[in-house]
């Protein structure tokens, strides 16, 4: 299954962010936020592509 909407990245990123907050690992927290942003970009790109079709 293709993750066209970035859902996997959004969920995995949120989990990493929460894990980082709980453990005090700032790098893990930032990594999670970056992965969430990647998911949002994928989602927006898919939305734009669908609008153009």
Swiss-Prot record:
SUPFAM superfamilies: Hypothetical protein YjbJ. Residues 27-53 are annotated as: Disordered. InterPro entries: CsbD, YjbJ_sf. Residues 44-53 have a biased composition (Basic and acidic residues). It holds the Pfam family CsbD. Belongs to the UPF0337 (CsbD) family. This is UPF0337 protein LJ_0034.1. It comes from Lactobacillus johnsonii (strain CNCM I-12250 / La1 / NCC 533). The lineage of its organism: Bacteria, Bacillati, Bacillota, Bacilli, Lactobacillales.
């Amino acid at each position: 299954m293709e993750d066209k909407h970035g859902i996997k990245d959004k969920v995995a990123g949120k989990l990493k962010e929460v894990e980082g907050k709980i453990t005090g690992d700032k790098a893990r927290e930032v990594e999670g936020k970056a992965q969430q942003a990647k998911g949002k970009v994928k989602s927006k790109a898919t939305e734009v592509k669908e609008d153009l079709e």
